Amino acid sequence: MWGLCKKHFPSNKIQVQERNKALKPKKSGSEHKTKQLFPVFNCKKKEKGVMIRFAILRNANTSLLSARSICLFTQAPTYCHVRLNTLNKSITTKRNSLTESKRHVHDGKHFFTTPHQQQQTKLGEIEEGHSPNIKGEDLRSIGQAITHQRNKRRKQIWSAIFGGIFGVILGYSLIYRVIYLKEQSFLPLFPSSKIRKLSTRDLKKVDVNQVQKLSKLRVLEILSGHDMIKEQYGVPLLDKDGNSPTLNEFSMWCEDQDPCVTGIVMEPDDKRDSSHTWYRIPFVCKWRITHRPISIRGTIDDLLNRIGLETADLFEIISPERVYGSFKYEYPLQGDSHALHLWFHGEIELDDDSLIVYNGKYHVDVKLQEIDLFRREKNGQLIQYVLYKNEAGDK
């Protein structure tokens, strides 16, 4: 028979709770940690409550307060009951929070996702480096870096393209034609004007003094037969000192019949004497800068000759060189494969307010194109009088 003394049973509720804590079995450290990490939601095996038998002696006097304490002690909840109640409360609070969050969602982007999942996605993006709170300066610096890299890459591509083209042209002109075939090669650089000054080599082939004298005689001959000159200046035409007028300025230049380009002429370094000024690369080649015309007809003839045809086999060209007064009958410079126009310009001063200006072309004889009189009138105006103009001539 089990029995309990009065001193072992508490008389109030606080003492009952303290007694329950004292009777609660202590858990080991490993079991306590595993229950914290992996909480048990469904306890299939419920811990049985402690059943205590009380036997009261017949002759013992037990008060009602002691009996009440014994009843409270026997009805105290176990640890498993308290744990299950706590877990049920936490699950119900989570469900209520999720339902409340779903009710308050009004954004279309959360139609298939919850705000909680969206926050997790944003956190993942931030961890990967895609932060939405990046400053504007950082974005601009990133954009500038990308633009700089693209421009650098574009420059490298274009540099490689132009470098390859230049290497192919230089290799063909210098290595193949000059060094291997021992021929002259011309490398064009940029287009040039048809009109250019006579070079030192050209001036050696043209008698400039003769052209100057002939042009002056032709001008005085035309002016002596002009009515305005006869009335206002008289015949023979004299200057302010009573002497024959003299030339104040005279110049000559040439004009090609075809478009011209400026380029580099390269030849094998054979050390022969030449009238041109050459720059030499020892044992490789010699080169100089010159102007050359681009003959379209000559280019077509060369292409047809390479495939065994001639121009007459395809079409007939009526060349202006066969017409009198054309380029064929202009002054041809010796050693050149093309004809040139030789132009001249002169000025004759009659007095302080009158100046004769003329220009023309030279071949075997002088052919004047235009003669003008520039005179300052009494009112101070400078007036140009056209005394002669060759309408049929080609300028």
UniProtKB/Swiss-Prot annotation:
It is found in: Mitochondrion membrane. One of its GO terms (cellular component) is peroxisome. Disruption phenotype: Increases frequency of mitochondrial genome loss. It comes from the Eukaryota. Its main location: mitochondrion. It is a single-pass membrane protein. The chain crosses the membrane at residues 156-176. Keywords: Membrane, Mitochondrion, Transit peptide, Transmembrane, Transmembrane helix. Belongs to the AIM39 family. This is Altered inheritance of mitochondria protein 39, mitochondrial. It comes from Saccharomyces cerevisiae (strain ATCC 204508 / S288c). The gene is AIM39.
